[in-house]
From Swiss-Prot:
It is found in: Nucleus. It comes from Bos taurus (Bovine). The lineage of its organism: Eukaryota, Metazoa, Chordata, Craniata, Vertebrata. The keyword Transferase does not apply. This is Deoxyribonuclease TATDN1. InterPro entries: DNase_TatD-rel_CS, Metal_Hydrolase, TatD-like, TatD-type_Hydrolase. SUPFAM superfamilies: Metallo-dependent hydrolases. A divalent metal cation 1 binds at residues 112, 222. One of its GO terms (molecular function) is 3'-5'-DNA exonuclease activity. Its main location: nucleus. Its EC number is 3.1.21.-. It comes from the Eukaryota. GO terms for cellular component: nucleus. The gene is TATDN1. The keyword Metal-binding applies.
Length: 297
């Protein structure tokens, strides 16, 4: 058994890729169980399955109910906030609230919510701002921490966060790729910073990682997305590799599909960049996560 313990705070296990389906076409057999097994082998103890909208949150919860290690989030991603307006916004919010309220114990966070100004083609700035703020009602009512998203929107994100900070018990800004100053401002609000492959692309990203105290960090894969590519600045620190094929083969990882087992690679990059003992850092990351998302453990 692995000497490491991990909570993958951001894992998209409802993604059809883990069922062998790519762009609606079945390319290989459903291998979700193998994916989970590989992750458990390297020490993943809990998987926080991300909910990206109402339906996705229902699917994430449904999956979470199949395994004691699975948990989920309830919320609406900034790029999908149009859904509030396509429906009755209050009713949509109420459905999210009911889903979270009636499944405490499995639902451990409100999210994924926040702002994403890199992808305004999916949802306008005004709509994102409005429904990010609206979702604080969910955290306020449920007393659950938030799983937050901030892309190219730091000033507006901070503004909304500051205004509503007393309405949420805390949370993490996941997949962080901002500046040292941005990280410091978020930490000033008592928020944690989540790192995955997308957070480790450039030397500047690595410098930001060094600047954050370990007791404010969390770790994630965001799989099947955000894998560490060879072109990423962090990739040179990876020690652990997995048997990987370009075409699916039983018992192997698939080249362009990130998996939760790759969380060990994120740890290796983080500990090398920060010059910290990997086991010590892993324990700190694990304890940070338990404190915020699993306080009754």
């Amino acid at each position: 058994m692995s000497r490491f313990k991990f909570v993958d705070i951001g894992i998209n296990l409802t993604d059809p890729m883990f069922r062998g389906i790519y762009r609606g076409v079945q390319k290989h057999q459903d291998d979700l169980q193998d994916v989970i097994e590989r992750a458990v082998q390297i020490g993943v103890k809990k998987f926080m399955i991300t909910g990206g909208n109402l339906q996705d949150s229902k699917d994430a919860l449904h999956l979470a109910q199949t395994n004691d290690m699975f948990f989920s989030t309830v919320g609406c991603h900034p790029t999908r906030c149009d859904e509030f307006e396509k429906n009755d916004p209050d009713h949509y919010l109420m459905e999210l609230l009911n889903l979270a309220e009636s499944n405490k114990g499995k639902v451990v966070a409100i999210g994924e919510c926040g702002l994403d100004f890199d992808r305004l083609q999916f949802c306008s700035k005004d709509t994102q701002l409005k429904y990010f703020e609206k979702q604080f009602e969910l955290s306020e009512q449920t007393k659950l921490p938030m799983f937050l998203h901030c892309r190219n929107s730091h000033a507006e994100f901070l503004d909304i966060m500051r205004r509503n900070r007393d309405r949420c018990v805390g949370g993490v800004v996941h997949s962080f790729d901002g500046t040292k100053e941005a990280a410091a401002a978020l930490m000033d609000l008592g928020l944690y910073i989540g790192f995955n492959g997308c957070s480790l692309k450039t030397e500047a990203n690595l410098e930001v990682l060094k600047s954050i105290p370990s007791e404010k960090l969390m770790i994630e894969t965001d799989a099947p997305w955000c894998g560490v590519k060879n072109t990423h600045a962090g990739s040179k620190y990876i020690k652990t590799s997995f048997p990987t094929k370009k075409k699916w083969e039983n018992g192997h990882c698939l080249k362009d599909r990130n998996e939760p087992c790759h969380i060990i690679q994120i740890l290796e990059i983080m500990s090398a960049v920060r010059d910290e003992d990997p086991l010590e850092l892993a324990n700190t990351l694990y304890n940070n996560t338990i404190k915020i998302f699993f306080p009754d453990m």
